[in-house]
Amino acid sequence: MLRSRVLSTAKAQCRQYTTTSTPKAVPILYDAALPTFQRDAFEPATPALLPRRTFLEMPAVKKWFLKDAKDNSTLNTTYLAKWGSTIVPLEISNDNDFTRIEQSFSFFLDSYVPGARAVRRTSESNDFFTSASNTTTPTAQVYLAQAPLADLPRALVNDVPTPEIVLKAGKGDVYDSSIWLGRAPTYTPLHRDPNPNLFVQLAGQKVVRLFNPSIGHGIFAKVQEVIGGSASATMRGEEMMAGEEKKALEAEVWDKTSSYQDDCLEVNLHAGDALFIPKGWWHSIKGIGNDMTGSVNWWFR
């Protein structure tokens, strides 16, 4: 009887091991030429990574970021502080709470300076403090998320010129564009966009997981049913950014034991890399490592 139990346990463990799956890699385009992009990505509405480092020479890559002594990406505050009075959207979050505020760009930059007013930085976090600089207990993280390029000073917009494939692959209609800045870890929950999306990494590293429209909708609907939620699938809603819904979505998308691993595409993005996300494809994004991360994206059609 003991031998039978041992064999049964071993078989169960073997089955569990052999059925473990991993996400598939996002295909990489042969080159970054417009015809290639149209033929192999845009027209068939297929996720694709442009050749690595295609946008490494984009001005923002070198102007907005520096390398510290540990070769980690940091903000070039001397350059960016010139536009400190610009009002930007910030997300303040921790495991259980999330809120959005609008503050000056200088307020955001100060959150990455040790001992700054109302904010204190450590080497491996972007902890936000709501009281004096001698406070020692972190309360949340600060992320400049989805700041429209149209609301930024012209000089900063010029640092992230719109790529040719955005302007010429389709109708030439750029629906919107945004900047994303924050020290890892950063997080965007599972959602889908109403238009095709070109996502360019400027600094640091991000990992993206994608699901086709049918699978992604199934994941989202499953989580909403389990938690009794009613979130929008196309908005970065507050209910998706903290608490029960965030944890449930994150588990289905990112947990190694998730049943959706085999239905997932995954890519790690570094500075200069660009990912095409077709309309309707569900995706979730994480900033990883200890670097400052920076990204820009364009929604177009």
Segments (PLM) and residue ranges:
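N-terminal chloroplast transit peptides
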Residues: 1-13
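N-terminal accessory scaffold of Fe(II)-dependent oxygenases
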Residues: 14-276, 284-301
